[in-house]
């Protein structure tokens, strides 16, 4: 009997209690990435709605968004944009500041990574509060990109990130949800 996509993914995602600090349940997709069947099913499911669409670029958020985004870009025959923390890219960059729980951080991409009007899908492994994804959307829009969607394997709906992105007019696609944090 074929296992459902949700069951396959939930079985492949490891939960680590009290990481990176007490009270947090860390959802680790490295086990999913190591499971060839689960990894393929996740990527195929994220790609499916956009197959045949003209998607110019996939933007992946450091670091797990690079892995998923690279696979998605390959399947859609799209270019790939790495979005990284400040100071990690070698060429001239454009950056945006965003709030973290305990302060500010900055993310950036190369200034020539996207052209105005290009259709872009944003990819990361998980959406929690949405702060990082929202900053990435602002960064891409600042350069004139049209955000087609933001795709994540995991949604933590209790933390409100999906709703935050949808309020910004972003179509959000997730594959599985975990209650709590």
Curated annotation (Swiss-Prot):
A GO cellular component entry from the record: cytoplasm
GO molecular function: adenine phosphoribosyltransferase activity
Pathway in which the depicted protein is active: Purine metabolism; AMP biosynthesis via salvage pathway; AMP from adenine: step 1/1
One GO term of the biological process aspect: AMP salvage
Catalytic activity: AMP + diphosphate = 5-phospho-alpha-D-ribose 1-diphosphate + adenine
Primary site of residence: cytoplasm
EC annotation from Swiss-Prot or TrEMBL: 2.4.2.7
Family to which the UniProt record says this protein belongs: Belongs to the purine/pyrimidine phosphoribosyltransferase family.
Subunit structure comment from the entry: Homodimer.
Role played: Catalyzes a salvage reaction resulting in the formation of AMP, that is energically less costly than de novo synthesis.
Protein name (Swiss-Prot/TrEMBL): Adenine phosphoribosyltransferase
Organism in which the protein naturally occurs: Chelativorans sp. (strain BNC1)
Phylogenetic classification of the source organism: Bacteria, Pseudomonadati, Pseudomonadota, Alphaproteobacteria, Hyphomicrobiales
């Amino acid at each position: 009997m074929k296992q459902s996509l949700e069951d396959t993914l939930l079985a492949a995602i490891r939960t680590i209690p009290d990481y990176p600090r007490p009270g947090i349940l860390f959802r680790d997709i490295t086990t999913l990435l190591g499971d060839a069947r689960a990894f393929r099913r996740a990527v195929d499911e994220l790609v499916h709605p956009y197959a045949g669409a003209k998607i110019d670029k996939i933007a992946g958020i450091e670091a797990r968004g690079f892995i998923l985004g690279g696979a998605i870009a390959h399947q859609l025959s799209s270019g790939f944009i790495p979005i990284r923390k400040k100071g990690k890219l070698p060429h001239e960059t454009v950056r945006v500041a965003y709030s973290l729980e305990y302060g500010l951080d900055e993310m950036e991409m190369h200034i020539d990574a996207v052209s105005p009007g290009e259709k872009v899908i944003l990819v990361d492994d998980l959406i929690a509060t949405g702060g990082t994804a929202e900053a990435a959307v602002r960064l891409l829009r600042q350069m004139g990109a049209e955000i087609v969607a933001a795709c994540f394997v995991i949604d933590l709906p209790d933390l409100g990130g999906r709703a935050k992105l949808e309020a910004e007019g972003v179509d959000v696609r997730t594959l599985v949800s975990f209650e709590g944090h």
